Amino acid sequence: MKKLALVVGLAATLFATAAEAMTVQEFLTAAARIPRNPTALLRADTRRLIAEVRTAGETIGNEREAAIAAGRRPAFCPPGGRASVSADALLARLNSIPPARRNISVTQAMREWMAERHPCPAS
């Protein structure tokens, strides 16, 4: 019984850690350790960062769709309804955030970037 409780507790801790949003500083620190070559895609750190960006993109995309469905003005309006981002552009944007603000989540950084990059026309 104690063993089961320990396993459940450990699983809950790991799940809670995974569910926390990564900060921009954490993202940049992890990205700096990844070599810029084809083998980078084989690294677990690379896959973790890709998943973080994918999750952030899905989150802000869902927020945009929810705002439209509710009749509110969305935070950003990309042409064609979708925005694509290259790895270099993303890293450049995250590196441009002042160190004092790098405690924001990657999701928040992307939200702000998309609002700046793809502003919605005034109604």
Task: Give the role of each language-model region.
Residues G80-S123:
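Surface-exposed, polar helix/loop patches in the mature regions of secreted/periplasmic/lumenal proteins
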